[in-house]
């Protein structure tokens, strides 16, 4: 483990100012208000285990299947979205090299049958620490994606679930958030924290950031609990909850180990049908 990775594990910010730094707030506000935002950039956020990466991978692949130009930026050091799209985690260049080492974004993008990927790696775990002394550190990802935004209809960013500099970069790069929520009671507990984070970032960094949609995952409509959770989420996010729900499906769980999205692994299964339905609903909302 590198010294940067050790530092990254020890350094855990607890508030907005410790991530951004007071001296960056005015600059951030000015840039956010005077410059255009990255069009068609969607950030997938949420706690681990709710289907965040699964949804990022499979919605991107489903849109590619439907003929759209899609880039998936894996901004999580675990790099599960990278491997889920069939890209080796040990690829020579990735998003870390773009942000820290100055590699051109296009040179780091990997083309796959399921969509283009800006891959992640374990090196990104220390990236947040390395960014601390860099100018405009919260805008590094946005600048990297700006270089290729005209090449794609949609850019998806899979980010870490914790509040840290990597996540802040993703929030500054995105127009919208897509929030997967598991159809279980405890999934409701983080909603207030999520909305508070969005309000802070919108107020200080990215005034156009919005909740694009909320997706219920691992959903079992046969249980009263799942139905109650769905009702509560719809009350919390009126008009934002997708009609499509993602069911529990063993084939969805198997697909990542084969390095394939579900539409390539088993297009006839319930999971693939659900993500294709989600892709069509997504397009209706965003075209």
Task: Give residue ranges: language-model regions.
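P-loop/Walker A NTP-binding region and its immediately flanking N-terminal helices
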Residues: 1-50
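P-loop NTP-binding core
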Residues: 52-287
């Amino acid at each position: 483990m590198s010294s940067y990775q050790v530092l990254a594990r020890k350094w855990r910010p607890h508030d907005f100012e410790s991530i951004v730094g007071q001296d960056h707030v005015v600059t951030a506000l000015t840039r956010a208000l005077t410059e255009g935002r990255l069009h068609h950039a969607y950030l997938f956020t949420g706690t681990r285990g709710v289907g965040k990466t699964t949804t990022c991978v499979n919605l991107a692949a489903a849109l590619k299947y439907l003929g759209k130009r899609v880039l998936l930026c894996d901004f999580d050091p675990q790099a599960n979205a990278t491997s889920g799209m069939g890209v080796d985690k040990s690829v020579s260049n990735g998003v870390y090299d773009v942000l820290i080492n100055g590699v051109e974004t296009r040179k780091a993008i990997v083309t796959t049958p399921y969509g283009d990927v800006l891959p992640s790696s374990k090196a990104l775990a220390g990236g947040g620490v390395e960014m601390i002394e860099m100018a405009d550190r919260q805008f590094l990802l946005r600048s990297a994606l700006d270089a290729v935004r005209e090449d794609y209809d949609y850019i998806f960013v899979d980010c870490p679930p914790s509040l840290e500099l990597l996540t802040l970069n993703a929030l500054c790069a995105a127009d919208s958030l897509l929030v997967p929520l598991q159809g279980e009671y405890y999934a409701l507990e983080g909603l207030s924290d999520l909305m508070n984070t969005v309000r802070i970032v919108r107020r200080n960094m990215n005034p156009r950031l919005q909740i694009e949609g909320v997706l219920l995952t691992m959903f079992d409509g046969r249980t009263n609990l799942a139905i109650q959770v769905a009702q509560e989420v719809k009350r919390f996010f009126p008009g934002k909850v997708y009609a499509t729900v993602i069911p529990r499906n063993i084939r969805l769980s198997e697909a990542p180990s084969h390095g394939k999205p579900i539409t390539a692994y088993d297009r006839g299964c319930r999971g693939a049908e659900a993500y294709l339905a989600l892709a069509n609903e997504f397009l209706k909302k965003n075209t």
